[in-house]
Structure formats: structure tokens, C-alpha cells
């Protein structure tokens, strides 16, 4: 077992002068200097954070300073609780209060700092720049800090979910889980150990992927981490070419924008060897463009938060929902009452020995440990899947996203995949809204391409001409300028449902010409 500190300490001994971090301004830290900086900063900060093994809020986006701060706090035996700076100040302060944190480091946002001080006056709040000042970290005389404890079950880091269904929930990552969260980039994504690795830091550090699978993997594999503070497709394209990036982890939204930039610039990106994506369903049209304009092996990852990586598929050339179980996990396809045969759509449960531990709002770390066994027994069954005889698993969607209309199960991804190919459609999300007669009604929320035009009637005709079953056609269309999304580019479906339920501007299309079955409580079919 290796902690994050141990993995980076060994990398220092192997390649002491390798550039570990590079940012857009071409500021560089070699791996040895990064280790020394975090060690010195940890010593300098010890007076402010004398409580090892306690969670401590870190509110920051991607930056060299954020990397140094998190590594220093980890070196200091604190438990960095990384938070999304795009959350509202009131939400961040509430997370600090409910997490019972006594310290917070904030990336120079006066509003957030004031909100924390107001909500929890006892919290010591420090600006990130006051903790870390680039290369001007003060040298500290005296004895060096002892190595961080290596108790397997001790909390190492806290990450928060994307908050698609409300205030984000904390996930505590124990020390023993760090190594596997890095190594899966080798076992599933094909990343090889060596100083040839130049990894693009596109994913946010406050997400488990952005921290473990991108930052720590790049440095622990003796490579270089290229910081991306703000995503702009044109600037990222230039950064990839300038730094000769060999690997990147991105969301479908990132890749969609990047393929457009590559096409417009006529770039080739010949240095890219590995492209891994997750965070949302990959539309077929975007996947085709990714394979056309972006080189390197493509890997689709599913389940990075709940079970580190429960499913994946390498050499992706077709619809991105056909996947296989990952090296560190086993998958059962179940329903209430037991397992099911291959070919039947039902719920996936992933088992992973070092699965995350859920952190309830009011729970302390002690209470958290008491919940660990029950969480392991519960599994992480949230995906509707079909497994074929070869062991391939097709992810149809999430259990809580499934629409039940007139007794029929409708998976949003089935409808979204059809509509995504319609002329003029840039993005589409299908949701179910309450319907007095049918329980739920299918609604398509559509973002059009710049300059494009479309109507509910045209999109409905497109669905009628497709292979989509008639009862699955959307009954309403809502045209939006943009979709509400989290920092991981996941659509915030609850916000979308609230918006659609409150609006009367949705275009309504005719009911289907064919009959749809619905079911009475007795189980007898009723013609629709």
C-alpha cells in the first residue's frame, strides 16, 4: 500500500529533475522542487493546522498553488476536503458547517471567505495565496515532519459529489485506496509508467478523477502534469501542441468543443496517445468526431465516483455505452430478489474492495466508519444495464433517471441518442415530468447549434422516422440556450425538471397514433 505522499516521494528519488508541473504561463516545478515545496509549506503551516486527521476545506480550481497546498496539507497529516469553487458561497459555508471543519483554505474569493466566517465564526479561514506563493515558499528551519501515517482505514481525502440532486455529499477516500485509484489508469486506460508521460490537467482537482487519475497518476508515473485553470478549446489546443501532451482525461462536452477547434485549426495533435473520457453519456455524433479528429487510444470510463472505476471500454469505435468490468471491481446484474439472466435490462451492482465511504451531512469521521459495512453490503446499484453472453455490459441509464409513462419503462439515453443525430441539435436531455394521466410524460430539452433552427414538429417527425418506439417519443420540447451543468459537465436534471415544470413555453406534439399499454394495479393491461 502506498499513500499519495509515498508515491510522490518515490517519484522524487527516481526522476529528481523531471518537470512535475507546467502551467499555461510556462511556470515549472520539477518533481524534487515540488516535494520540497510541499514539505516546507507543510512545516510552515503546522502552527495554523495543529489537528492531524481532521477534515479541512480547500476551495479552489486548478492551479499550481492548489496542487502545492493540497500536497502540503496531506503531508501535514490533515485531511483535505476539496470543494467546487463554483458552488454558491452559502452552499460552501453550509458544507463546512455540516462537515464540522475547523479550518478552510479559499482561492482568493472574498465572498466565500466571508460566508464561511459568518456561518461558522469559529473556522480559521486563509486565502490560498497567503498559504502558497508560487516559488516563494518560505524556508523553515528545524526538524522535518515525520511521514504521514499509513493506517489503511484512516481518511486521506474528502471529495464531494457533483450535487446533481441537491447539496453535494462527501465521499471519504481512505489512505489505502490511493494506490488503486492511480493504478487503474494503467490497468484500464493503458497509461504506462515513465517520464514520457505529459498529462493534461483538464479535470478539476476537486473531483476524484482530476486528483488521483490525472494529477497524482502523472507525477507518480514519473511524468508531467500540465495545469489547465480555465477551459477554452482554442487555448487548450495550443497547450497540447506546445507541451506535446501524451494523455488527457475529459468529458464529452470538453471533447466536443475540442474537436471543433481541431477541425478549424487543421491541427493534428500527433503527440496524443491516450484519451479517456467520462462524466456523461458520449453521443454517437461526438464520438465519431473524436475518432476522426483526435488521435490516440480512446477509453470510456463509467462509475469513477462510486466505485473508482466499475466499467470501462478501450478502443472505443461504437456507441460509448458498451463496456466491461474494471480490474478492481466485479459486477452483478441484479433485480429485487436476486440475479437475472443475460439480456435482461436491470440494475448493476459494483463491488470494489476499496470503495468510497459515504459521509452524511452531520456525521463525524467516527460515525462514518460505523456506516462502512452497511455501505459495502448495499453496493452501488444505480445503473440500468444489459449484459450479453460475452460479458459486455450496455449501460442504458441511471435508475433514478428512468421515466415510467403509462407503465412503460423509457430510458432517456435511448431517446437522447436518436435526437442527438437530428439536424441542428447541439445537445439534448430527456426527462420525465409529472403527468396526471400517465404518471410521467417524456420531455426533450434541446439546445440548438449556432444559427440552426428547429421546431417540435420537425423533431417529432425525425423521431417518427427513426427506430424509436412510438410511445417513447417526447410529448413536449423545451428549447434552451444552455443546459444547467455541474463542474464535471453533468446535466443537473433536477434543476431542469423544476424549470420545465414551471414553464408553459414548451411546444407540445400530438399523442402517438399507436396504442401504448399501461397497467392497472391488478396488472391488467389498459389500452392507451
UniProtKB/Swiss-Prot annotation:
Question: Changing residue 169 to M does what?
Answer: Significantly inhibits the adenylation part of the reaction
Asked whether the UniProt record includes Ligase among its keywords, one would answer yes
Q: Which CDD domains match?
A: CBAL
Q: Which domain of life is it from?
A: Bacteria
UniProt-annotated binding residues for ATP: 161-169, 300-305, 409
Reactions mediated catalytically: 4-chlorobenzoate + ATP + CoA = 4-chlorobenzoyl-CoA + AMP + diphosphate
Q: Provide the activity regulation entry from the record.
A: Unaffected by 5,5'-dithiobis-(2-nitrobenzoic acid), 4-chloromercuribenzoate and sodium azide. Inhibited by Cu(2+), Fe(2+) and Zn(2+). Unaffected by Na(+), K(+) and Li(+).
The protein's UniProt keywords, in alphabetical order, are: ATP-binding, Ligase, Nucleotide-binding
**Chain's role:** Catalyzes the formation of chlorobenzoyl-CoA via a 2 step reaction. First 4-chlorobenzoyl is adenylated by ATP, followed by acyl transfer from the 4-chlorobenzoyl-AMP intermediate to CoA. Benzoate, 4-bromobenzoate, 4-iodobenzoate and 4-methylbenzoate also act as substrates. Inactive towards 4-aminobenzoate, 4-hydroxybenzoate, 2-aminobenzoate, 2,3-dihydroxybenzoate, 4-coumarate and the aliphatic carboxylic acids palmate, caproate, laurate and butyrate. Negligible activity is detected when ATP is replaced by UTP, CTP or GTP as cosubstrate.
PANTHER family membership: ACYL-COA SYNTHETASE, ACYL-COA SYNTHETASE FAMILY MEMBER 3
- Give the protein's recorded name: 4-chlorobenzoate--CoA ligase
Per the UniProt record, the source organism is Pseudomonas sp. (strain CBS-3)
| Phylogenetic placement of the source organism | Bacteria, Pseudomonadati, Pseudomonadota
Amino acid at each position: 500500500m502506498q499513500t499519495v505522499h509515498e508515491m510522490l516521494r518515490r517519484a522524487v528519488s527516481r526522476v529528481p529533475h523531471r518537470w512535475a508541473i507546467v502551467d499555461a504561463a510556462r511556470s515549472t516545478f520539477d518533481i524534487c522542487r515540488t516535494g520540497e515545496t510541499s514539505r516546507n509549506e507543510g512545516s510552515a503551516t503546522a502552527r495554523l493546522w495543529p489537528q492531524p486527521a481532521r477534515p479541512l476545506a480547500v476551495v479552489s480550481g486548478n492551479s499550481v498553488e492548489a496542487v502545492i497546498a493540497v500536497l502540503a496539507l496531506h503531508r501535514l497529516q490533515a485531511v483535505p476536503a476539496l470543494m467546487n469553487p463554483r458552488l454558491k458561497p452559502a452552499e460552501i459555508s453550509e458544507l463546512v458547517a455540516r462537515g464540522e471543519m475547523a479550518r478552510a483554505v479559499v482561492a482568493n474569493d472574498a465572498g466565500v471567505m466571508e460566508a464561511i466566517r459568518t456561518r461558522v465564526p469559529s473556522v480559521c479561514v486563509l486565502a490560498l495565496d497567503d498559504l502558497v506563493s508560487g516559488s516563494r515558499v518560505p524556508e523553515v528551519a528545524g526538524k522535518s515532519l515525520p511521514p504521514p501515517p499509513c493506517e489503511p482505514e484512516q481518511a486521506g481525502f474528502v471529495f464531494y459529489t457533483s450535487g446533481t440532486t441537491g447539496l453535494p455529499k462527501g465521499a471519504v477516500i481512505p489512505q489505502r485506496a490511493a494506490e488503486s485509484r492511480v493504478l487503474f489508469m494503467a490497468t484500464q486506460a493503458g497509461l504506462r509508467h515513465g517520464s514520457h508521460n505529459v498529462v493534461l490537467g483538464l479535470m478539476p482537482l476537486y473531483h476524484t478523477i482530476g486528483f488521483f487519475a490525472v494529477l497524482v497518476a502523472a507525477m507518480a508515473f514519473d511524468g508531467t502534469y500540465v495545469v489547465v485553470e480555465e477551459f477554452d478549446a482554442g487555448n487548450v489546443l495550443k497547450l497540447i501542441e506546445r507541451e506535446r501532451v501524451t494523455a488527457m482525461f475529459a468529458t464529452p462536452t470538453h471533447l466536443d468543443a475540442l474537436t471543433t477547434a481541431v477541425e478549424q485549426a487543421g491541427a493534428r495533435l500527433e503527440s496524443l496517445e491516450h484519451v479517456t473520457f467520462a462524466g456523461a453519456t458520449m453521443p454517437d455524433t461526438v464520438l465519431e468526431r473524436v475518432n476522426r479528429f483526435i488521435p490516440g487510444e480512446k477509453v470510456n470510463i463509467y462509475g469513477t465516483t462510486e466505485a473508482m472505476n466499475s466499467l470501462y471500454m478501450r478502443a472505443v469505435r461504437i456507441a460509448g455505452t458498451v463496456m466491461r468490468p474494471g480490474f478492481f471491481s466485479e459486477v452483478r446484474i441484479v433485480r429485487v430478489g436476486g440475479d437475472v439472466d443475460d439480456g435482461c435490462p436491470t440494475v448493476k451492482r459494483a463491488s470494489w474492495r476499496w470503495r468510497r465511504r459515504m459521509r452524511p451531512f452531520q456525521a463525524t469521521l467516527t460515525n462514518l466508519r460505523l456506516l462502512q459495512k452497511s455501505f459495502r453490503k448495499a453496493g452501488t446499484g444505480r445503473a440500468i444495464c444489459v449484459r450479453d453472453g460475452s460479458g459486455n455490459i450496455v449501460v442504458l441509464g441511471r435508475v433514478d433517471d428512468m421515466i415510467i409513462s403509462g407503465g412503460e419503462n423509457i430510458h432517456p439515453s435511448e431517446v437522447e441518442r436518436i435526437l442527438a443525430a437530428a439536424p441542428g441539435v447541439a445537445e439534448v436531455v430527456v426527462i420525465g415530468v409529472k403527468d396526471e394521466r400517465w404518471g410521467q410524460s417524456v420531455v426533450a430539452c434541446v439546445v440548438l447549434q449556432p444559427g440552426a433552427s428547429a421546431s417540435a414538429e420537425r423533431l417529432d417527425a425525425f423521431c417518427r422516422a427513426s427506430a424509436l418506439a412510438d410511445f417513447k417519443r417526447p410529448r413536449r420540447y423545451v428549447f434552451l440556450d444552455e443546459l444547467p451543468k455541474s463542474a464535471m459537465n453533468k446535466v443537473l436534471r433536477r434543476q431542469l425538471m423544476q424549470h420545465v415544470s414551471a414553464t408553459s413555453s414548451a411546444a407540445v406534439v400530438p399523442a402517438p397514433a399507436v396504442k401504448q399499454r399501461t397497467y392497472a394495479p391488478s396488472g391488467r393491461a389498459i389500452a392507451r
